[in-house]
Amino acid sequence: MMATQAQAQPTGPQAIDWSQPRRREWGTALRALLKLLGNADDTVQVFRIMRALNGDTAAKNYRKLLTTQQGGRLAYQRIELSERFSDRAWIDTLPEGSVGGAYRAFLDRTGYSAQGLADVSYADAEVERNVEHPHAWFGRRERDIHDIWHILTGYQAD
């Protein structure tokens, strides 16, 4: 009789199979929404909802990005916005009256940081951080631009 060995179960972040379209996870989104309604300060739930509902959006939007010359240049450069938005010296060069100036005022007023929000987005994620894949990069870019939408619309986190 052969002894069977138990296979080790993965305990760390899981790799995403980028060859398969991602599906929306409605149940996950609903559970996170209910938790968020119970505690509006639980920012982790916001990112759970976003991940659950995004489905294949990052892949589709990345393909759209590549349809323009400027988009192709952005994709080629692959600048990580959380790093750029965390560079206070760079932020301080942005002129008053610009979107960048409004972003600086937002950071000063709220005490938020781009890296802090990026960290929260991974607080319960079962995927690796900073995966080097075009769709993952684009998903991070969409996450990091989210604060800019708050600034432009005047929508506050509270």
Predicted regions and their residues:
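Extended, charge-biased low-complexity segments
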Residues: 2-65, 72-78, 89
